């Protein structure tokens, strides 16, 4: 990748030198609402599930008429250990070799997929190798590349696979928050035959839900069935969330239905009763009951000491999900 010229503030006039697009970039060839998703960035970690994520993203990008960019991003093993545990320089060398093997494994996944027909496919080394200085944390590196995409495809964490140990536990929320892009999170087990035909939306009157639902509108426009699930929650900030004593839905249900209808989407809105101890479990149960093949929800959480602390529903879904999840923060 070309690196921008170094210049101090106010020292030079803005450049008008054109920047050439990469060989795999092309005008969108898809039609319909899904054409909005033109560039897909896929996270590879060297694990076998990376191949599933990459193949799925490529299949979806082909439907959208877009392209896929694959990127390997993990935290180097040696940076996670205290200096006392590293001993002499030999230990660092061995750990660096292990990191290099993980990257080679990711590249093998990419090379194998590149041999198959499908949407245009490209490899990115990320900002650390494309003009960066010091080593960036893995989530920040991927988020920096995802800024220039429509969707970032991530995987559910699998602590039983040593090839994913370099993926921080808060990787998904950190990438979603730092990039501002919606994420398609793929389960660590199973194969997705269909996606986006039967959509379940977890709705809460919040910025996170609104952002997730808005970014998922192309999915909803092409879905065969859209269901929106709501739970009665205490401390409601944006109006009444539950039906009244006569069972009449709150006004916000009509607002939501009218907004979706303005986009040509007819959705069934259901009230699931009072929220239990963990809405995440209720949500996954509802997804199974309705045979949903895509769950749309906001990603809730906040940072503390550079680590993401997730809301209960978000944490549960990311831990126990068995279907693809579309998230936005």
Residue ranges and their predicted role:
Residues 154-157, 180-189, 298, 325-329:
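Short beta-strand elements of ligand-binding domains
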Residues 62, 144-147, 177, 218, ...:
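Solvent-exposed polar/charged
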């Amino acid at each position: 990748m070309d690196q921008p010229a170094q210049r101090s503030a106010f020292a030079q006039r803005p450049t008008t030198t054109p920047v050439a697009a990469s060989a795999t970039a092309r005008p969108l060839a898809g039609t319909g609402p899904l054409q909005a998703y033109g560039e897909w960035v896929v996270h590879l970690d060297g694990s076998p599930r990376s191949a599933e994520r990459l193949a799925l993203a490529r299949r979806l990008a082909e439907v959208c008429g877009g392209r896929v960019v694959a990127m390997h991003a993990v935290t180097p093993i040696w940076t996670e250990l205290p200096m006392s545990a590293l001993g002499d320089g030999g230990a660092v060398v061995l750990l660096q070799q292990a990191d290099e093997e993980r990257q080679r494994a990711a590249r093998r996944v990419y090379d194998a997929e590149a041999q198959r027909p499908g949407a245009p496919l490209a490899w990115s080394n990320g900002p650390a190798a494309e003009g960066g200085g010091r080593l960036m944390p893995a989530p920040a590196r991927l988020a920096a590349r995802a800024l220039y995409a429509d969707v970032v495809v991530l995987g559910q964490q699998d602590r039983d696979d040593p090839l994913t140990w370099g993926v921080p536990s808060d990787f998904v929320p950190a990438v979603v928050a730092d990039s501002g892009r919606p994420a398609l999170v793929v389960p660590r087990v199973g194969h997705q035959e269909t996606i986006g035909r039967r959509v379940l939306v977890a709705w809460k009157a919040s910025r996170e839900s609104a952002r997730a639902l808005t970014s998922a509108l192309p999915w909803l426009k092409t879905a065969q069935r859209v269901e929106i699930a709501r739970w009665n929650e205490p401390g409601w900030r944006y109006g009444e969330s539950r039906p009244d004593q006569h069972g009449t839905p709150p006004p916000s249900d009509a607002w939501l239905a009218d907004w979706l209808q303005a986009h040509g989407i007819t959705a069934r809105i259901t009230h699931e009763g009072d929220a239990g101890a963990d809405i995440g479990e209720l949500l996954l149960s509802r997804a199974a009951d309705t045979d949903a093949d895509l769950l749309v929800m906001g990603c809730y959480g906040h940072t503390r000491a550079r680590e993401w602390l997730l809301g209960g529903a978000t944490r549960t879904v990311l831990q126990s999900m068995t279907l693809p999840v579309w998230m936005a923060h």
